[in-house]
Amino acid sequence: VWVTAVALIVTVASTRAEEPTRVSLSGEVRGASGAHTVRVALWSEAGFLEKPVEEVDFDAGRATRYTFLVPRGRWAISAYEDRNENGILDMGLFGPREPNGFWRQFRGRHKPHFDEVAMPVDHDIADANIVLR
């Protein structure tokens, strides 16, 4: 019995040691006009909507497929089309003035909370697509 228990513990420990420490999180941005820069940002809860963990810009007319390598956990991804090329998502009285979206769809008029747009990531994900609206 002891030998079996020790073998089981060693097997579980070695399996966990072989798991990758980072996973691939990728997708594409849809709904962009193709005439302006598209900015994609990866967010953790700690710096949500203040300081992205990573950002990727796509020039006008370029493919908008992105990939982030992240530790397992909860992540949010946002994107917007920078129509006036000023480097920020312009806000109006009733919300954003430029097409934008999140990986986890959000339709509120208020500034989203991390929990409203974050998704759990514990394995490679290839279809973290964002639709700009």
Located regions from the model:
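A glycine-anchored, Pro-Gly-centered beta-turn/N-cap motif
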Residues: R62-T64, P71-R74
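A short, solvent-exposed beta-strand micro-motif common in secreted/extracellular proteins
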Residues: G73-R83
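Short, acidic Ser/Thr/Gly-rich low-complexity loop/linker segments typical of extracellular
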Residues: F48-R62
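Extracellular beta-sheet/turn segments enriched in Thr/Pro/Gly and aliphatic residues
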Residues: E98-R133
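Acidic, glycine-anchored loop motifs typical of Ca2+
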Residues: R83-M91
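Bacterial N-terminal signal peptides
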Residues: W2-T11
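Short, ordered, surface-exposed loop/turn motifs in non-cytosolic proteins
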Residues: A32-F48
